[in-house]
C-alpha cells in the first residue's frame, strides 16, 4: 500500500500538472509567429520560418475612427488576437477595445479560454460576473474612468453603460492568444440548427411560444 506521504506527493504533482496545462502553453523560443498557410494542424498555429519574420508580424495599425455602435446591444468589441497579429502565437495574450453607446451593453458572455482584466478609459460601466453552480453568486461593481475589474476564466460576465447621454470606452486584456467568446443569448436562442423548443421551454420554465419567439429574433453579434 502506498504511504500517505507518497499519496500526498502524487496529488500535489497532479495539481501542478493540471495548472501547467490550464492555460496557453509557454513558448520554447523567442517567438513563434503564426504561419496561417501551413498545412500542419496543431493546437494554435505552426511557426513561420524565422528568416521570413518582420516587425509587421508584431504590429497592428491604430484604428483612429471610433468603431460603430449601431447594433441592437449598443456596443462594439474590436478584438486584436493572433488572427490580427501573428506574432501573438504562443504568447498567451490578446487585447480588445470595447465601445459602448449610451445605455449600451456587452451582453452576458463567457471566454472559454481566458481570464479578462478590463480598464475603463472613458465614461462609467456597471460590470459583473456570476459564479458557477450551485451558488450562482453575482459579483458586480460600478466602474469609472481608470477603474479596473477582473473576470475569471470561463465565468459569465457583462458590462453595461448606465449613462443615457454619454458613451463609454474600455480596454480589455485577455490571457490567451485566442480567448474565444460565447454570447449566452446568441448561443441558446440563435444556434444553428436551433435547440429544440421543448428543451428550452423546460429549461427556462416558459411556454414553447415564448421560446419560438425568442428563436425567431436576430441575435446581434457585437464582436468585429
From Swiss-Prot:
InterPro entries documented for this protein: Cupin_1, Germin, Germin_Mn-BS, RmlC-like_jellyroll, RmlC_Cupin_sf
Family: Belongs to the germin family.
Additional free-text comment from the UniProt record: Member of the 12 germin-like protein gene cluster located on chromosome 8 in the major-effect quantitative trait loci (QTL) for fungal blast resistance. Partial suppression of the 12 germin-like protein genes increases susceptibility to the fungal pathogens causing rice blast and sheath blight diseases.
Gene Ontology cellular component terms for the protein in this record: apoplast
Main location, first listed in the record: secreted
Keywords, alphabetical: Apoplast, Disulfide bond, Glycoprotein, Manganese, Metal-binding, Secreted, Signal
Assembly information from the UniProt record: Oligomer (believed to be a pentamer but probably hexamer).
Protein name in the entry: Germin-like protein 8-9
Taxonomy, superkingdom: Eukaryota
Record domain Cupin type-1: where: 62-212
Native organism: Oryza sativa subsp. japonica (Rice)
Stated role: Plays a role in broad-spectrum disease resistance. Probably has no oxalate oxidase activity even if the active site is conserved.
Gene Ontology molecular function: manganese ion binding
Localization per record: Secreted, Extracellular space, Apoplast
